[in-house]
Amino acid sequence: MHVPASPAGSQPATATRSTASDSALTRTILAATLVAALLRLFRLGHQSLWIDEQFTLVAAGLPGHVVWRDLLDNVHGPLHTLAVALFALLFGDAEWVVRLPSALAGIALVPAMAWLARVWTGRDTVAPAVWLTAGSPFLVWYSQECRNYAFLLLGATLATAALFELARHCGRGAVLRYLLAAAAATLSNLSFALLLPLHAWRWLMPGPTRRARLVSAAVVGAGLLLLVSPWLPAMGRIWDWSRLAPGREVPAAEAGLRGPHTMHPAAVPFALHAFAMGYSGGPSLRELRRSPEGAVRAHFAELALAGLVFGLLGALGLRAVARRRLLADTCLWLVAPALAVSYFAANNFKVFHPRYIVVSLPCCLLVVAAAFADLGPRARRVLAGVVAVLWAVALARMAFEPKYGREDYRTAMSKVRASMAAGERVLAVGAPEPVEWYGRGLTVARWWLGVAGRPERMQQTLTESLAAVPGTWVVLSRAEDDDPEGRCASWLDARTPVARRWSANGVQVWHVMRADVVAAGDPQQSPN
């Protein structure tokens, strides 16, 4: 059948519609990227640096310069650490500066997720995927933290998208693209290895490019192993791999890595809630540490609504990916990392925490995006509106409510610095690194909170520390794991006038004079 030629300078109607649709989708991706930038850069430096961020600063040589030996000891995140060191060299070590690399990675994640959505769940899921990525409170939180998780997510997303492309075309350029992205993810955080089941399946699965993929997989595997080889000695030294031996029973006397709950019964539900709502969509982390049951009761209505909405979207999303014949990928992407980290936690090798399975988050977002893509217009608008309201509340809390923020070491130490007299010192208890960072130039000593489990020993060592100088500023934070009963705080309260103790959002401060300290053998006596 003869098809008449189009008039000069014109295009077929279908091509015109396709071009217009592509332009609209590009504008959507750009708009979502702009929103992501606004959310991630807004008040980037308003929270204090907390203890985990201090580990990054130490590895980056701050204050000072990066040292190769410190990089080799940093088994998680040498790439991110180098970025932090570079930004600090150029712009200083303010909070917003050292967090800026994470924010930029979080912004770049939006177009990366657009690519991943297009090659995995389909073009119709791209728009919901980019908006979910832009607004996710969980992603905003880690984009505003001086840790490597935003880098990991960006590298893992790009590597997975590149891998899915190899099923269609496995040329040298496509393989190199995967290798570079996988290398970036590996050098950002070793949690990228949790995607090994999914990536191995995708390298080996049947298809027209299987032969080329098998050859390329060997080269890529050797290249990645060579890349991480400088960090292998540190991995062997830092982690106790014997704990992962099959059939090993955890001795009763073996201390948990983080208090009694290396693997809390609610760990997986909490991870799913955090993926959906971040750490400000319900009770704050400090509320949960103080009283999990009380925190859940106080926020039950909000938790129930979030669970209902995201539970429904999750169920619809699983049906949508099943219709696309992607359930095998989904199981390997979601279940395998959770099982691996659960095994680590059960053997007291690593604590179960949402950030340790963050490589599964892109899959969660794409499952929800598939649900939105398959909904009718009215249902899509209603559910999108509910999610937008829930996330707006969570993001506002994160930005403006101190109880949902990180511990406020900056305010605590500025007050100490303003009131500290000559000859006095600071005693950092619980998490000393942030106290030392914000107390630079002051005399700061450490006291190990783990001894709080032996009250007599605690009283003796604290008394000795407090009696060493005329006055001591005791700065206590993150005591939940080592001193859940609050023995140290109670002991200090009994010896300090009310006028000389105060708190600053997760940080408690006591100004203890030598004369305030009573005999360690009389814990109930008070000088007041």
Task: Give short role names for the model-derived ranges.
Residues 1-39, 118-119:
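Start-transfer (signal-anchor) and selected internal transmembrane alpha helices
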Residues 11, 524-525:
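Low-complexity, intrinsically disordered or signal/transmembrane-proximal segments
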Residues 29-516:
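Membrane-proximal helix-loop-helix interfaces that form the catalytic/acceptor-binding platform
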Residues 32, 523-524:
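Solvent-exposed, acidic/polar segments of extracytosolic/periplasmic ligand-binding ectodomains
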